[in-house]
Design a protein with these regions (language model features):
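Conserved catalytic/switch belt of AAA+ P-loop NTPases
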Residues: 16-24, 34, 38-77
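Short glycine-rich substrate-engagement loop in P-loop NTPases that contacts/grips substrate
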Residues: 2-30
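C-terminal engagement/docking regions of AAA+ P-loop ATPases
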Residues: 150-171
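C-terminal helical "lid" of AAA+/P-loop NTPase domains
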Residues: 118-123, 129-144, 154
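Alpha-helical scaffold elements adjacent to nucleotide-binding pockets in ATP/GTP-utilizing enzyme cores
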Residues: 11-18, 47, 51, 74-78, ...
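Conserved RecA-like P-loop NTPase ATPase core
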Residues: 12, 35, 48, 63, ...
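Conserved AAA+ ATPase "SRH/arginine-finger" region at the nucleotide-binding site
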Residues: 3-6, 80-93
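Helix-loop-helix "sensor" segment of P-loop NTPases
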Residues: 96-117
Length: 171
């Protein structure tokens, strides 16, 4: 995994060299995940081309930007583009219900009060990550006050503090 925020051309070339060596030495294939590829400069993206063209790596890149504008044409033409669409309200609701019940989630420590699910779903706007983050914040506030029932007010309060973070980094 390479983060476009932290990696330079040198780091990209090191990963590619390591992947090429692993492929030649043992046949081991490397999948390189590049988060926020839109933050890669043209030279960083150019550094990937030989590895992609020669199949030394399989690359998976994630971006919140339009790749037609943020990814260089030669790299884009050698990529399979998958567009992810916002989830519908039903899918967000199901995700939140699973998180409430799951042992790896909130483990039934809290319940949603009347109207809370609708508010969570509306604020999430099709983004499951945002919905889960908001649920977690509302659950923490509810438990902090010694209750188990997440109210609409809990969700609104959690959203008000979380919106500041979401606005700053758009996540």
């Amino acid at each position: 995994e390479v983060s476009a925020v932290n990696a330079g051309v040198k780091e990209v070339r090191e990963v590619i060299a390591s992947a090429k060596h692993a492929l030649m030495a043992s046949g081991e294939e490397t999948v390189l995940f590049i988060d926020e590829v839109h933050r890669f400069s043209k030279s960083q993206q150019d550094a990937l081309l030989p590895a992609v063209e020669n199949q030394w790596i399989s690359h998976v890149a994630a971006t919140t930007e339009n790749p037609s504008f943020s990814v260089i044409s030669p790299l884009l033409s050698r990529s399979l583009l998958l567009v992810l669409h916002p989830l519908d309200d039903e899918a967000i609701g199901e995700t939140l219900q699973r998180a409430l019940k799951s042992a790896s989630g909130l483990n039934a420590a809290v319940e949603l009060g009347e109207g809370s699910l609708g508010v969570l779903t509306r604020i999430a706007g099709g983004d499951a990550r945002k919905a889960l983050t908001l649920l977690e914040a509302a659950a923490a506030a509810t438990l902090d006050r010694g209750d188990r029932l997440i109210t609409v007010e809990d969700v609104s309060t959690a959203a008000a503090s979380a919106l500041v973070r979401w606005d700053e980094d758009q996540h």
